[in-house]
Amino acid sequence: QLLTVFTDITCSEIKPDVTQEQIEALPEFFIQTASALKDDSYNKWEKEFRIREYCPYSSADEWADKLMTRKYGDLDNPTGIYVNEGDEVVVLVGNTHGQSISIQNIGEETSKGYAQTSVNGDIYPLKEGVNKLTAKQTGMLFVMYNTNIQNPDAQPIKIHIPLGGGKVCGFFSLKEHQTNEKYKELIDKADYKYFCVIGNAIILYFHHKQLKAAVPYDILSSIELWDNMIQWQQELMGIEDVYPKQMNNHIFAISPEGGYMWASEGRIGFVYTVLGDILRKSYLMASRNCLLYTSDAADDRISV
């Protein structure tokens, strides 16, 4: 019945000759989405994060073993949609190309008396077509699509989380959004406790309020700072030929509400009171005496 109105099972586009009568014959849940698509009233910001193609990422566990390092993060595909406990969410999945895919709900955990982002959460396997899940806790939804990225079948997978399922918070992706102006627009709209910034090599999953106070506008210099440091580390390790052709996971950074700075399996932590320190290159170089890797058109050099 859905395919009498929509062009495919993700229900992200409707057929051009669809009538209102056909829309009203749909199951009640899908009428709102079909109507919004037909009359072009689907909020552009909501639509950007509810209808997306998710790219494949390597297995962080597998590559930690191969490279004999600690594990990179595996939360490489944030949806920009969060849920509250008890929320029911419909997830519409397109062609999976024979790949395994799931959604993970990442909430908070308590460590040594303070809150921090959990390293993992409830996982809901997905299949092609209509999937329904009920959230057991408040958290951000991440698509888990980890596979051999050199496999020809490791293709992007289209997913639609229709209106009424969770709430859009959004995220900033360097690859997609590119400008400081877009970052400001997105972080200003966000209303969840955490906000996600995706660089080429690092993901910053930090407290929204503290991140916005630390970097109200110039996020590009912050991303460049950390992407460059990770690139330098990879060159020192001799894995620059592996990353990102064979292994493409990000370093995943969180902002615990206690402790200080640390690195562990799957994530690194910076207590949320120091975000203004670690996201400003000038401060790191002047006050932290940090050794930084910088690149420019003329040369690659180490700066102190």
Task: Please tell me what each predicted stretch does.
Residues 71-74, 123-126, 179-180, 185-188, ...:
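Short amphipathic alpha-helical surface micro-motifs
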Residues 187, 192-295:
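Juxtacatalytic substrate-recognition/specificity segment
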Residues 27-28, 178-179, 215-218:
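Alpha-helix capping and helix-coil boundary motifs
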Residues 113-125, 162-174, 212-236:
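A signal for specific C-terminal beta-sheet/loop modules enriched in small/flexible residues
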